[in-house]
Amino acid sequence: MLGGSVKSEVRASEPSPTCQDPETKAPHQDLPRPNQPAASGSVPSRPRRRPPPQRPHRCPDCPKAFSYPSKLATHRLAHGGTRPHPCPDCPKAFSYPSKLAAHRLTHSGARPHSCPHCPKAFGHRSKLAAHLWTHAPARPYPCPDCPKSFCYPSKLAAHRHTHHATDARPYPCPHCPKAFSFPSKLAAHRLCHDPPTAPSSQATGSHRCSSCNQAFGQRRLLLVHQRSHHQSEGQGERE
């Protein structure tokens, strides 16, 4: 009896060959016990990443997929042209309630997204995010022709037109041979050909001529009008 008990104690104290061999070690033996401190120099295991969400509901009109049939049904309204959410303040309608909510801010004038660096505020979060780049010291889009740099690729493209203004003028005037580098320059130039002739109560321009009551969108156009028209009238009267 005594020999059998001693043998059982020895067997219990000796580790099994399976535990000694790292290749045959069971997976649970690598896990630390609740009250056992981690070995020095050991790297704690990272938490497992969640698997990507299942999106079994695919749109037949585009590559997008959705988790729920209701999301797919809402998305397909954009393809069908259905706009079931009308604006109560204007004739516009929208496919999604979120688009309608964003649009209604234009009527209320609300600007809930304020800039933390300046007094400006914006109606949409995306507008604020784009504005914050103007405060950032980094301007990752340098001009290859001069030391200037810009926050946006569109600003760099518009600036580069100034270096090649004589070469690139893709916006011609339909009334004369002139052409311009920017649509805004063409729009300002076309006011010379088609000045507003409505009365002061209906004119859209804020700069009005005191002699003939014509209105202009820009002050320089008003000055051009006064020099070209009223100076010639004064010369005719003196003659």
From Swiss-Prot:
Residues in C2H2-type zinc fingers run: 57-79, 85-107, 113-135, 141-163, 171-193, 207-230
Source domain of life: Eukaryota
- The gene designation is Znf575
Functionally, this protein is described as follows: May be involved in transcriptional regulation.
Show the taxonomic lineage: Eukaryota, Metazoa, Chordata, Craniata, Vertebrata
Organism whose genome encodes this protein? Mus musculus
* GO CC terms of this entry: nucleus
Protein name, per record: Zinc finger protein 575
Q: Where is this region: Disordered?
A: 1-62
Pfam families on file: zf-C2H2
Which family would the database say this protein is a member of? Belongs to the krueppel C2H2-type zinc-finger protein family.
Q: Where is the composition biased (Basic and acidic residues)?
A: 22-31
Q: Which UniProt keywords apply?
A: DNA-binding, Metal-binding, Nucleus, Repeat, Transcription, Transcription regulation, Zinc, Zinc-finger
The compartments listed are: Nucleus
GO MF, one term, reads:
DNA binding
Q: Where is the composition biased (Basic residues)?
A: 46-57
Q: Record's Gene3D superfamilies?
A: Classic Zinc Finger
